[in-house]
């Protein structure tokens, strides 16, 4: 039996943060994929584990089936419980520990929410709303500008090393091309475009460093297979 069960979705970025951490820490897991079109994530069995009815939800079978949801909370749990060598995290007494937590909150409230809304209005909304697409694309650029400033004199967000703070940004940034692509609608009006490398070179270089990690490559290979199968 795998150490963890991860309730997931083949396309949603947030569960794949958890996969990244599990792979970085060499922890075994089984993924159960829900079909959002059928509303499977709202089934009674899943709501009993996660009353919010969203993914990811993680069950730790080696800790009395301890269950936790919210992707960045899961990252903290995995780091505190299983990253004893602090490969991708920091110890509680490290002066940068709360900076790490800070960036996880920034990812959740700054990147995740905005990228998600941009995706909704680009791919799923029932009608084109140019003002919404413009707003969220501009907000993406604002957040990338914040990261650009943070990374102007460092390679990673915290303590000059790769941590779950960096990891948390990877899956949503992986979708940047699609968020600025044509999507569901063709707009007659001009909407913001993005040249990531040219406009935000420090953030782009950071993202490329993250994508080069073996665990990240393996995660996106698994993601591609999951999309084919689900």
Swiss-Prot record:
The UniProt entry's GO CC annotations, sorted and at most eight, read: cytoplasm; cytosol; nucleus
Checking Gene3D superfamilies in the record gives: 1.20.1050.130
CDD domains hit by this protein: GST_C_Ure2p, GST_N_Ure2p_like
- What this protein is called in its record is Glutathione S-transferase 2
Q: Which UniProt keywords apply?
A: Transferase
Which species is this record about? Answer: Schizosaccharomyces pombe (strain 972 / ATCC 24843) (Fission yeast)
Q: What is its EC number?
A: 2.5.1.18
Residue ranges of the GST N-terminal domain?
Answer: 2-86
A single Gene Ontology MF term assigned here is: glutathione transferase activity
């Amino acid at each position: 039996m795998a150490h963890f069960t991860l309730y997931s979705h083949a396309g949603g970025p947030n569960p794949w943060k958890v996969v990244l951490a599990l792979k970085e820490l060499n922890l075994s897991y089984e993924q159960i994929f829900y079909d959002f079109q059928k509303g499977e994530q709202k089934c009674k069995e899943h709501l009993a584990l996660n009353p919010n009815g969203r993914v990811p939800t993680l069950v730790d079978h080696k800790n009395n089936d301890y269950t936790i949801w919210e992707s960045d909370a899961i990252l903290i749990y995995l780091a505190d419980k299983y990253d004893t060598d602090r490969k991708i995290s920091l110890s509680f007494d490290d002066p940068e520990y709360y900076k790490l937590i800070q960036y996880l909150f920034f990812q959740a409230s700054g990147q995740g929410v905005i990228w998600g809304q941009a995706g909704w209005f680009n791919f799923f909304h029932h009608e084109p709303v140019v003002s919404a697409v413009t707003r969220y694309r501009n907000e993406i650029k604002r957040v990338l500008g914040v990261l650009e400033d943070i990374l102007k004199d460092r390679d990673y967000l915290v303590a000059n090393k790769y941590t779950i703070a960096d990891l948390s940004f990877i899956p949503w940034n992986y979708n940047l091309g699609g968020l600025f692509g044509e999507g569901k609608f063709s707009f007659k009006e001009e909407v913001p475009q993005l040249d990531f490398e040219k406009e935000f070179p420090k953030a782009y270089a950071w993202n490329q460093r993250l994508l080069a990690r073996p665990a990240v490559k393996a995660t996106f290979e698994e993601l591609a297979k999951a999309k084919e199968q689900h």
